[in-house]
Amino acid sequence: MPDMNAMRIIEALRSGVPSRAVGKYFAEARPKLIRRISDALDEVAINGKSDSFLYTGKYGEGKTHLLNTAMTMAQENDMVVSYMPISKEAPFDKLPVIYRNIVQNTYLPKHEQPGFLHKLWGIGASSPLASEMLLYAAKELETDKLYYLFQCFLKTDDQEEQFRLQADLEGDFISPPDLKRIYRRIAGKAAKMNVPFSKTKHCMDYFSFLSRLFTAMGYNGWVILIDEVELIGRTGKKARQNAYRNMYRFLKPTSLHATYTMFAVSSMYQDDVIEKKHEYENLEAIFPNDMEPGKTVLDAIVSAEQLNPLTRDEIAEVISRIIDFHAKAYDWKPDLDVGKVVEVAQEGGSLLRTKLRSAIEYLDQKYLYGDGGHVSVGALEQEDLSAEEADVPSLDDLND
């Protein structure tokens, strides 16, 4: 009988679209790198010290697959995971937008669907978790807005208010007058905030708060996975520089607790963006008095570790797994020489993605016709990162 889970794995590999399921079952490749990430996750979980890892890779060589593998490893280590691919709809130059997108794509261990705030429903305002988080929000953040907001969230008996306060924690920020009004109704006194809250200036407080909240909830830490970083290169000059400054907050995570952030970047970024668009000169022109964040990120991309192509032995190991999944998916018993399938894969294209697709096409033909035939893939076009879009202020910029 066909195995539907195995069929999903095969179809994901055939399409070339990155899949969490594929990351779960194909973690054997690049064992040294996987071990290093595993050790880093253990260090974060044990000591609570935050860290980061930025790497580059060619198109189709497994950048996103590595993030999916890290996601599986983190969840097995009882860590919360957030995954954010950068896009036009989810840019990286505006921290409030980053926060909203990350919260929307945050997964608790052993959960297939995103979401975590429902775990706070019903927690008493005098519980150990509440006491820890209220003390943290009052003493450790730049502003004390979250102290008042979280207190209201825990104490309100009005469901509509609770949903509005939860929406704030999800990135739809409540106005200060509305928060003060809710606090006065609940506490019977005025909220005296130490610093007026600005979502563009103080949004990092929310990341810090969540990083502490996840460990207070009993999890071993927070893993943030940022994909498609090269799409920063398609934005305008100032937007790119702001994006680098935001990357710096996670690359050097001094304000985050027990957090591990991974950035996946195209290996073309140095040539197509940093050099061709003169990013170091742009940095000096836009932020002449505060160059360190941007320079640190640009230096990190230039010196980043690049994913090496898999060795023949590593490809053979992956293809052996693919043969097993293909047999389960279509309920057949392949009588195959693994070496022959590896040979077909090696001839099928230069990129890992096309090699695996060629191997699957060969298995399809063996299954359907008993003859593998000849499979080949032509050269793939690569995206041009040299074009850019003009800086256009968003509604968030205009309303802040």
Give, region by region, the residue ranges found by the protein language model.
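Alpha-helical repeat scaffolds in large eukaryotic proteins
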Residues: 42-45, 211, 252, 360
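The catalytic "switch" region of P-loop NTPases
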Residues: 2-7, 179-336
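A short, basic N-terminal segment
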Residues: 1-51, 371-400
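P-loop NTPase nucleotide-binding core
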Residues: 52-53, 57, 61, 65-217, ...
